[in-house]
Amino acid sequence: MAQIDGLPPLREVIAAHKLSAKKSLGQNFLLDLNLTARIARVPGDLSGADVLEVGPGPGGLTRGLLAEGARKVLAIEKDARCLPALQQIAAAYPGRLEVIEGDALEVDATAYLSPPIHIAANLPYNVGTELLVRWLTPPDWPPFWRTLTLMFQREVAERIVAKPGSKAYGRLAILAQWRAEAEIALTLPPQAFIPAPKVHSAVVHLRARTEPRYPADAAVLSRVVATAFNQRRKMLRASLKGLTPGIEDHLAAVGIDPTRRAETLSLEEFCALARQIAAG
């Protein structure tokens, strides 16, 4: 890719700008441009689409997304040290890369982007889950994004695609599979990163559904699921006791045995319970 976009290899970029990954920001830099190109291809055809990228760092994935033909990339970066490297990419792709210095949790990205919108990111580990839940629980169908292509620790990725009854099954699996079709697209070893994390990483691809698999209010479903799995080893009548008065009556109304545990409930059952609670 260095030959394609005329930009130097990422190791040279990092050396030139004296960049080092900050543990406090959850940073791990992915330097192999062949890998970032593979990740950039996961969403599919990006021509005519805008892409939101969170935590671009020195810009490896950014370069991949632009090379894949993204109409525009909005890169939100909290670390000011990375901005000169990103501006260097912006100069190579005039009018197609906009960089915002800030916290992705506080920036309304939709104000800067036009549909269709994809999200792709090597997410900072310390905010990745919070951002994902936010993207999975807007009130609107379909959501503002078409696909999410996100890198996480492999353990988190496995939680997103987990099935009922497994140890990994929980809030992320239910919200992700309610909102989207989710799959692990590829797995990356620790040595692909600088510094090398202690665990493998994985890229998760989520394709937004145009309507929910089962009707439910996003906020209510999120609250029910979070409460149920906060004490996942307890029976539902105990784990959900503080959620709303008369929880056993609500469970009975939708045919769920109150002695079951959260990890045994299907997505359909959680949605039925959320509808029942919302109806009062």
UniProtKB/Swiss-Prot annotation:
EC number(s) recorded for this UniProt protein: 2.1.1.182
Database matches in Pfam families: RrnaAD
A GO term, aspect molecular function: RNA binding
Cellular component terms per the entry's GO annotation: cytosol
InterPro entries per UniProt: KsgA/Erm (IPR001737), rRNA_Ade_diMease-like_C (IPR023165), rRNA_Ade_Mease_Trfase_CS (IPR020596), rRNA_Ade_methylase_Trfase_N (IPR020598), rRNA_adenine_dimethylase (IPR011530), SAM-dependent_MTases_sf (IPR029063)
Catalytic reactions on record: adenosine(1518)/adenosine(1519) in 16S rRNA + 4 S-adenosyl-L-methionine = N(6)-dimethyladenosine(1518)/N(6)-dimethyladenosine(1519) in 16S rRNA + 4 S-adenosyl-L-homocysteine + 4 H(+)
Key words of the record: Cytoplasm, Methyltransferase, RNA-binding, rRNA processing, S-adenosyl-L-methionine, Transferase
Described function: Specifically dimethylates two adjacent adenosines (A1518 and A1519) in the loop of a conserved hairpin near the 3'-end of 16S rRNA in the 30S particle. May play a critical role in biogenesis of 30S subunits.
Family of the protein in this entry: Belongs to the class I-like SAM-binding methyltransferase superfamily. rRNA adenine N(6)-methyltransferase family. RsmA subfamily.
Name listed for the protein in its UniProt record: Ribosomal RNA small subunit methyltransferase A
Organism: Dinoroseobacter shibae (strain DSM 16493 / NCIMB 14021 / DFL 12)
